[in-house]
Amino acid sequence: MEFSIDNNINDGAVIKVIGVGGGGGNAVNRMIEENVKGVEFITANTDVQALKNSKAETVIQLGPKYTRGLGAGSQPEVGQKAAEESEQALREALDGADMIFITAGMGGGTGTGAAPIVAGIAKELGALTVGVVTRPFTFEGPKRGRFAAEGIARLKENVDTLLIISNNRLLEVVDKKTPMLEAFREADNVLRQGVQGISDLITAPGYVNLDFADVKTVMENQGTALMGIGVASGEERVIEATKKAISSPLLETSIDGAEQVLLNITGGLDMTLFEAQDASDIVANAATGDVNIILGTSINEEMGDEIRVTVIATGIDESKKERKSSRPARQTQMQSSTQKTVLDMDQAKPISAEEENSSFGDWDIRREQNVRPRVEETNFEPIEKKEFDTFNREETKAKGDDELSTPPFFRSK
């Protein structure tokens, strides 16, 4: 029996990237310059001049009647109304996509106001929708920061997963002499790596294969996410590559607390089974105890001695991380409250040099509670109750030792 594949039915998952506003358009241009393959690029903006500089194959002017091509003036409500005016054009451009990345800079007018509208349209079309946005620098002012926070909150309601890049962290990872364009390229690399990584997962066949269905399982309706790629060579290559992939210094979240992880390892013919195990162990230890890891491996002879690790982690919830970190403390308190009091001070915790130099010395309120003796174990000396002495010993002391040695019964005779 012969089987045939109809390429007209499904030619693979369609991925589209739309940059909204000035920041989003710049990110798309840099991705095109980096020759990212397997995706379609779209740029949408209220500013006609910015659209003229776009390298995307599809450009959309947002709100031509409302803004007349002059931009949103840093007002998110203007960007929102412009996107609503151009909803039909956006819908036509996004239609047919299986996965849509929406990238924008938060805090301004067009990106902040229009990105949530674009995300809503993408979700209505049934596409897996991922937002990748930047939060402005603190020195850009509190008003811009407030606009960004509001825009991120609205966007999060309309996307499956969201990656937030903190511009403030650029100041921590780049040198003071680093040119501005190069610094912003570092932020755009987060988007580029995520898009390229997912595109490669879907299009490149693997020995243990991953497909778009796996990507959808990990990313659909999962909230905050982390995406990263790490490449390394040498003896500890898989360890170094995995740590790079899960440690993105620009993202506002970490893999700690992730519930779903898609892990793909690509290497040459010398890649071993134990290296795949090491990568999986590192990811599992960094995430939650019950993390679901979907593992894929690919052999690429062109990799040589290098190994590339791609990680997509989702379901990251800050409140879960807080509950997880506070749980051991509560358990310790419960255990200590049920334990029997121990008075052997040799078992006390050693005192550090800092505690020894403290004005409180080695006093510890936790030990104080434990070493305080119970009332029933205390022996009271008669001297403590002199005022209740019925024999009136203070008066008899002056009468001499002989009289003290005589019992009161005979002295009364």
From Swiss-Prot:
Polar residues bias spans: 328-341
Keywords: Cell cycle, Cell division, Cytoplasm, GTP-binding, Nucleotide-binding, Septation
Chloroplast keyword on record: no
Positions of GTP binding: G22, G23, G24, G25, N26, G109, T110, G111, E140, R144, D188
GO CC term (a single one): cell division site
Molecular-function GO terms, alphabetical: GTP binding; GTPase activity
Chain spans, region Disordered: 318-344, 374-413
Name of a matching Pfam family: FtsZ_C
Places the protein is found: Cytoplasm
Region forming the signal peptide: none
Keyword GTP-binding set for record: yes
Any single GO BP term: protein polymerization
Main function: Essential cell division protein that forms a contractile ring structure (Z ring) at the future cell division site. The regulation of the ring assembly controls the timing and the location of cell division. One of the functions of the FtsZ ring is to recruit other cell division proteins to the septum to produce a new cell wall between the dividing cells. Binds GTP and shows GTPase activity.
Entry protein name: Cell division protein FtsZ
